[in-house]
Amino acid sequence: MAANKFATLIHRKTNRITLILVYAFLEWSLIFFILLNSLFSYFILRFADYFGLKRPCLFCSRLDRFFDASGKSPSHRDLLCDDHALQLHSKPVEESNCGFGEFHNDLVHRGCCVEKISSSLCAPIESDFGNLDYPIGDEGQIYNGLKFPRSIFVFEEEKVGSVNLNDSQEETEEKKVPQSHEKLEDDDVDEEFSCYVSSFDCKNKEIATEKEEENRVDLPIEVETAESAPKNLEFYIDEEDCHLIPVEFYKPSEEVREISDINGDFILDFGVEHDFTAAAETEEISDFASPGESKPEDAETNLVASEMENDDEETDAEVSIGTEIPDHEQIGDIPSHQLIPHHDDDDHEEETLEFKTVTIETKMPVLNINEERILEAQGSMESSHSSLHNAMFHLEQRVSVDGIECPEGVLTVDKLKFELQEERKALHALYEELEVERNASAVAASETMAMINRLHEEKAAMQMEALQYQRMMEEQAEFDQEALQLLNELMVNREKENAELEKELEVYRKRMEEYEAKEKMGMLRRRLRDSSVDSYRNNGDSDENSNGELQFKNVEGVTDWKYRENEMENTPVDVVLRLDECLDDYDGERLSILGRLKFLEEKLTDLNNEEDDEEEAKTFESNGSINGNEHIHGKETNGKHRVIKSKRLLPLFDAVDGEMENGLSNGNHHENGFDDSEKGENVTIEEEVDELYERLEALEADREFLRHCVGSLKKGDKGVHLLHEILQHLRDLRNIDLTRVRENGDMSL
């Protein structure tokens, strides 16, 4: 995977579990977007086919060239997998014009032409070791029924002392392949292939051309010699696709630098820390690497490096060293072979082979090469590839045998397997830790949910209780409101009653004033009468006793009036409201009135008896009218007693007074004065008795009404309701009486 800022940032700031989860999510997102892209591409093609339109080019429809900030032509070779890249490389020239667009037609055409270029196009690179030969094989690689030449392999010899390559040259010369075997028949094909060798690790001079074209592959080579270092093979070749699969000893703590050129350079950089010591003798390696051996197979295995030009514009491949599986890109079809000769020492010193970065740059075609010469060169190139592949296979077997025989060395595959097992164990440990954390988080989540549920239940209970209290408060508030309303109504009623009672009290006060005025007038009249009687009795001696009696009676009448006035003032006003309390008062007043009535009746009877005796004496002294007068007097006395008992004394006395005035007008003054005084006393007594009887009747009626009220109160709510109705009617009647009294008072005023 390409290293960028996001990957570096997330590697540094996150742990491994989070990193795995993040990349899993990103990969699934990428799969989803790829699926959408595939669906849209399929619909676009179906749409074009259905309406007979020309199918669009998949590469021309891309927007990379519009959004590329570098301004260079975009590379589409990284968008092709190995299978489709091989299919594009294997297409002939005549099929290159089929439905890929102008740019991609040129790309396929260039790939087909480069396939046919002989390996003799690349001249050998001169160095301190001499010219590097490029043997050409006869066989190519067959993949999916298609034949293509082998890939490029470069071997390096490593010794203790490092030897700079081309120390005298800062820029290597451009070598062209001699054209002794073929001639150019067609000048339309023009290609130039330049090979540059540079070393980044040992400060070797870079081999470069001044021409800057589209594609470039840099393969820096470092050659180091060692006297006693063992030989080491840093890679092996896959049998099917001949990709470079780097293998080296790796420390987990070391980070391997991954270099990716913007122009699509294919760069492999390996830093070797440990030397792989082979147990085999140096003769086996020297037989493989020495160009002077007699056997052709050993001569073929002396190839140190082979390179192949890529058809596409640029090839980007970044190889990650370690337990990750390396990414491989298909290398081009034009090989370039570089032979580094092996120098054997007499002491058969072991040598170490190290694979370093080799940069190969391809230029735009500038040579006119004959097509027939290219076809002939292709056959020799395929045979060289076949022999190279066989030699590398034998070398791999020898190196593996040497590793087995070496007690200190460890096989690369075994070490990789061991590291893979360690990584798996670590991964299992991480998974177990993740499972433990997941279980802990699940337990914590369950506890949290239980706590949340408990809090929700408590909250619901508190809400229900709050609602219940709220309802109770609302009901209590309603009850209080009703009670306040009732109290307000009662207050209004009480105020009305107080106002009515005040009005009634005012009426009673007026009545009292009237009664007092009447009483005063009566007192004045009685005094006038008494004064007249006293003056008359003072003239005669016979009138002394009667005068004393009259004074006594007068004083007694005044005291009785005062007592009655005080009694009227002590009469309760709110009799109806305080029923039970007033019953006793009524009974006491009734008894007092009855006692006074008895006293007055006794006095009346005494007076009547005295009058009867005097009249009898007068009748005996008269001249013969005793019988008639006696008969009349008996009738009168009997009538008087009946009137007293029936409370009709005043009209009777008036009638008697009228008769006596008419009948005895010629009598003496003594008799007339005596009769007038007696009549005045009788009138006052009769008035008092009438008033007492009226009051007694009122008290009796009130007493009966109060008894009925108390009985109705004892019966319950119905009686109380009935009593309220009766009282309301009484109030209405009283209001009517009060209004009449007021109207009468206003009229009188």
Curated annotation (Swiss-Prot):
Subcellular location: Endomembrane system
Chief location bin: membrane
Pfam families the record matches: Zein-binding
Positions with biased composition (Basic and acidic residues): 173-184, 630-639
PROSITE patterns: GTD_BINDING (PS51775)
Keywords, sorted A to Z: Coiled coil, Membrane, Transmembrane, Transmembrane helix
Expression sites by tissue: Expressed in leaf epidermal cells, roots and root hairs.
Complexes and interactors: Interacts with myosin XI-K and XI-1.
Domain notes: The GTD-binding domain is sufficient for myosin binding.
Protein name according to UniProt: Myosin-binding protein 2
Species this chain originates from: Arabidopsis thaliana
Gene (UniProt): MYOB2
